[in-house]
């Protein structure tokens, strides 16, 4: 049996891809770190369908095959002087924090921002997430 405390080098296997509906059950569990009271599958599905095909939204997961390791949402907003990116719901699974998943997520966000000519990005985070703020 594999040692649960073993650090696994997943850097080569991590893929950043568009979020799929089938990812939502795993995300629902991960979102408990973001929203302690949880979020219903109905809300997740409704908001997924409202945003997934909109070009100004970047809904992505970091995955190893079908296993979701992390997720994020980026939204391009248009100000009068220039577009900018709002980054929300960044989450990395506790079992793979510190192994490059968050870095790959932010690299993908950077690419999306550049593609959309964003001048800057704003990261939204809840005040209680002190551990995540160290990242």
PLM regions: where:
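Conserved GNAT acetyl-CoA-binding A-motif
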Residues: 113-125
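Conserved N-terminal entry element of GNAT/NAT acetyltransferase domains
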Residues: 1-22
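Conserved acetyl-CoA-binding loop-helix of GNAT-fold acetyltransferases
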Residues: 92, 98-111
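Conserved beta-strand-loop-alpha-helix junction that forms the acyl-donor binding cleft
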Residues: 123-133
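Loop/helix-junction capping segments adjacent to catalytic residues or to phosphate/diphosphate-binding pockets
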Residues: 81, 99, 130
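Residue-level recognition of the GNAT/N-acetyltransferase active site
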Residues: 20, 93, 126
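Acetyl-CoA-dependent GNAT
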Residues: 18-83, 88, 106-107, 112
């Amino acid at each position: 049996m594999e040692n649960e405390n073993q650090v696994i080098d997943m850097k080569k296997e991590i893929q950043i891809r568009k979020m799929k509906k089938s990812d939502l059950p795993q995300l629902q569990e991960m979102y408990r770190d973001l929203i302690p009271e949880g979020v219903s599958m109905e809300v997740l599905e409704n908001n997924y369908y409202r945003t997934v095909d909109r070009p100004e939204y970047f809904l992505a997961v970091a995955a190893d095959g079908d296993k979701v390791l992390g997720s994020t949402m980026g939204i391009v907003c248009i100000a009068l002087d220039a577009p900018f990116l709002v980054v929300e719901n960044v989450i990395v699974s506790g079992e793979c924090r510190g192994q490059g998943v968050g870095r790959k997520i932010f690299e993908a966000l950077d690419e999306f921002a550049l593609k959309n000519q964003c001048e800057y990005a704003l990261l939204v985070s809840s005040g209680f997430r002190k551990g995540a703020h160290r990242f």
